[in-house]
Amino acid sequence: MTTLGTPYSPHATKVMLLGSGELGKEVLIALQRLGVETIAVDRYENAPGQQVAHHARTITMSDPAQLKALIEAEKPDLVVPEIEAIATPMLEELEAAGVVTVIPTARAARLTMDREGIRRLAAETLGLATSPYRFCDSQQELQAAIDGTDGQPAIGFPCVVKPVMSSSGKGQSKLDGPDDVAKAWDYAMAGGRVSHGRVIVEGFIDFDYEITQLTVRAKGADGQVQTHFCDPIGHIQQSGDYVESWQPHPMHPAALQKSRDIAKAVTDDLGGLGLFGVELFVKGEQVWFSEVSPRPHDTGLVTLATQWQSEFELHARAILGLPVDASLRNPGASAVIYGGQDAEGLVFDGVDEALAVPGTDLRLFGKPESFVKRRMGVALARAQDVEQARTNAKLAAGKVKPRKP
């Protein structure tokens, strides 16, 4: 039996989120609906999740001393990483000492904090199909990996270069020829977060489409961990950042089964409880592993319109040891609303027109500062079929006009 407490009481169930952006905000809301006392942590004040949490804390989460001091002061029952740029060795230390439980595990947080740990796990430990890849510490090493002059098979062109640690496509670029190498290296160095000076270069896979397979590890009625799969989510990315997603994405049954087999292999190894976003490339019946996030995924925002329990509710329930329902309610789609400018305190025109589009909803994230390509909101649409939902979501998103006041 799972027992939950009352916020602000001595018996409160306390959950701390490390990272409080738009995804964390929805997780916090889902936790609060279950009576959980929430602590939203971020690197800047008034982050979206901090606006709705019981407590807001601002620290440098990649600083081990600051992270340790905060966890020891707040004494949460669970620590839930929502971003990559965290001092994960400190989380491992605190978890090993029995100070706190990390979701899904501190090891999973460390392995997925950058592209190297999880790629080596998937390809080298689990033997899963991935694109050909190499890790490089200099522009010279990058050039050698592409050319094959490092004694290994050439990655060749086209290829994709990404910082070992970055998010939302920052620092990622596609290279079509030798003239792109220097630009790609410089762009990756500018876009990386913590592990400066190291990139992954991947051979380009000629895939038909890419999906996110949301995978949930949750306790069943017998107390044992069970794996649940949401319907596959299709999405379109531009420069590594999602701009549109929809659910369900039609797949060949064999490809769907392979996708779920891969997702289960990775999430079983990472362990713990919670929702994972497993990214996969698909061509016909072939499936390649790309990446995994041990937390709700940005493309999964569509589940706010499509599932009985959104990815955020699934995550909240799973980490609390509660049963989950990952089934689809109806087809739907999401479309991103960008800030379109560098400014603080934007206002949004056209909200009424957007919500007049049939079957639509909006999430405006409340980010205090906008950039040209910063995701400031998302339009959601549900419909009888995916194509209509995609049309309506894009139409609604286009009617929202962010501007300076």
UniProtKB/Swiss-Prot annotation:
Signal peptide: none
Domain ATP-grasp: 120-320
Reaction it catalyzes: N(1)-(5-phospho-beta-D-ribosyl)glycinamide + formate + ATP = N(2)-formyl-N(1)-(5-phospho-beta-D-ribosyl)glycinamide + ADP + phosphate + H(+)
Pathway as given in its UniProt record: Purine metabolism; IMP biosynthesis via de novo pathway; N(2)-formyl-N(1)-(5-phospho-D-ribosyl)glycinamide from N(1)-(5-phospho-D-ribosyl)glycinamide (formate route): step 1/1
InterPro entries documented for this protein: ATP-grasp, ATP-grasp_carboxylate-amine, ATP_grasp_subdomain_1, PreATP-grasp_dom_sf, PurT, PurT/PurK_preATP-grasp, PurT_C, Rudment_hybrid_motif
Binding site for Mg(2+): 279, 291
Listed GO MF terms: ATP binding; magnesium ion binding; phosphoribosylglycinamide formyltransferase 2 activity; phosphoribosylglycinamide formyltransferase activity
Binding positions for N(1)-(5-phospho-beta-D-ribosyl)glycinamide per the UniProt entry: 22-23, 82, 298, 367, 374-375
Segments passing through the bilayer: none
Annotated binding of ATP, by residue: 115, 162, 167-172, 202-205, 210
Swiss-Prot/TrEMBL GO biological process terms: 'de novo' IMP biosynthetic process
UniProt superkingdom: Bacteria
Purpose of the protein: Involved in the de novo purine biosynthesis. Catalyzes the transfer of formate to 5-phospho-ribosyl-glycinamide (GAR), producing 5-phospho-ribosyl-N-formylglycinamide (FGAR). Formate is provided by PurU via hydrolysis of 10-formyl-tetrahydrofolate.
NCBIfam families xrefs: PRK09288.1, purT
Similarity comment: family membership: Belongs to the PurK/PurT family.
Protein name: Formate-dependent phosphoribosylglycinamide formyltransferase
Taxonomic source organism: Delftia acidovorans (strain DSM 14801 / SPH-1)
Gene: purT
